[in-house]
Amino acid sequence: MSQITMRQMIEAGVHFGHQTRFWNPKMAQYIFGARNKIHIVNLEKTLPMFQEAQEAVRRLVANKGTVLFVGTKRQARDIIREEATRAGMPFVDHRWLGGMLTNYKTVKQSIKRLEEKTAALENAAESGFSKKEILEMQRDVEKLERSLGGIKNMKGLPDAIFVIDTGYQKGTLVEAEKLGIPVIAVVDTNNSPDGVKYVIPGNDDSAKAIRLYCRGIADAVLEGKNQALQETVAAAQETAAE
């Protein structure tokens, strides 16, 4: 698992919070002080809390669990998609659709529709559709892919959710709480840590900081998968030896 250091966090600007006038008092315990009216996050707290979150992810994935990566703000989208894909985990990078988890049955129907439309599009020319019809089909598929592409291979509800910016993803937190799904989240000084099981206090606006968080969580996923694979191989060898 990648060992994120204090130096890397400083270089990525993890310690820069929001303007002091926008602060959330619930984050007081994670704030070191203020500089030029900007709150400074206490990295002495962030680093071990991030490591704890990584360890929780590793354990969960080693037990065949699924972590849903969520980050729909502009700075996070590409990074969330890239790192979740690298880790082989589902993600939401475009827009959180209301009921994405609490109404998962309906979402599954939409995913089925996406699969059917994608298959139809692949055979559209042979099936005699006009260029205009094919273009309309492409638009439909692209629209569905943007909203659901990241979760189309998800087999059921996730076992945990990793969130960038709790203020931006309030809908995600509400649904997770309703379903009892634990949340691992980056929480900046202007947001509340309520409803987050594993709080990572830090900058949620800097692309460098977002990359650092996502890479660290994705690495934890990959380590968990590797552990699960090793345990499966060891069990198979044990059975074969009997």
Swiss-Prot record:
Domain of life: Bacteria
GO biological process: translation
A Pfam family annotated for this UniProt entry: Ribosomal_S2
SUPFAM superfamilies, alphabetized: Ribosomal protein S2
GO molecular function: structural constituent of ribosome
Entry-linked InterPro entries: Ribosomal_uS2, Ribosomal_uS2_bac/mit/plastid, Ribosomal_uS2_CS, Ribosomal_uS2_flav_dom_sf
One Gene Ontology term, aspect cellular component: cytosolic small ribosomal subunit
Keyword entries, A-Z: Ribonucleoprotein, Ribosomal protein
Family per record: Belongs to the universal ribosomal protein uS2 family.
Database matches in NCBIfam families: rpsB_bact (TIGR01011)
HAMAP family noted in UniProt: Ribosomal_uS2_B
The name this protein goes by in its record: Small ribosomal subunit protein uS2
Source organism of this protein record: Neisseria gonorrhoeae (strain ATCC 700825 / FA 1090)
